[in-house]
From Swiss-Prot:
Keyword Ubl conjugation: yes
Gene Ontology cellular component terms for the protein in this record: chromatin; Golgi apparatus; nucleoplasm; transcription regulator complex
Name under which the protein is recorded: Upstream stimulatory factor 1
Source organism per UniProt: Mus musculus
Bias (Polar residues): 1-17
Gene: Usf1
Amino acid sequence: MKGQQKTAETEEGTVQIQEGAVATGEDPTSVAIASIQSAATFPDPNVKYVFRTENGGQVMYRVIQVSEGQLDGQTEGSGAISGYPATQSMTQAVIQGAFTSDDAVDTEGAAAETHYTYFPSTAVGDGSGGTTSGSTTAVVTTQGSEALLGQATPPSTGQFFVMMSPQEVLQGGSQRSIAPRTHPYSPKSEAPRTTRDEKRRAQHNEVERRRRDKINNWIVQLSKIIPDCSMESTKSGQSKGGILSKACDYIQELRQSNHRLSEELQGLDQLQLDNDVLRQQVEDLKNKNLLLRAQLRHHGLEVVIKNDSN
């Protein structure tokens, strides 16, 4: 495995592995394994892989991806190494110290070389003090003698992943404790902002408060207009319902009084007409009386007017 990695990294700074090639020619089953279509395992066309059998016919596979930065002359050796059988579940555990300092000096860029190691929990879950297992994937970053816990970088960043058996990785490596992340994720603390619903609620409350104030003012004015309420309000607090009830009674009384006054006004109008007719009749009688007196004087008769009071 280590020799394959060196050969891939030292030949003119590029890694060239044909899709479906067999890593070990000794296994007769490798040819059948290499015929598996790439779309079934890795839908990304940029990922190349090689299948091989190991330890009793268990299928292991190696995936290599070269970024454009490495082809342009960037530092080689930066990559990710991960391994798990193709037939097992994806539940993985982290094994610390998978690469020792002796393994790291085999290449020219060993001082800055970074490895990300993945292992299935079923293969390394027994007797591992620094092993963690779960549905999520943990990553051990090994740089020289220090080990840091980080997250796996997606393949789009250009790193490559090498899958191998756990026995090849664990030989000669001592386990170390996993350190926490150097740069923990800290969500941005935003100042509390008033949401649209809160603004709408505050505006609605303000409108309701103004409406209640207006209603209270009108009720106070009614209590001042109604005679009974004005006296009771000075003695004890008058309820709004009592004020409105007395206001309704007072309005009913006013309506009845107005109706009665309208009827009396109609009677007065009729009396006025009768009075005018009587006055006209009195005037006519006076004129006739004067004519009769004039005729009596013409005939030599004197008219003596007797006073009833005498």
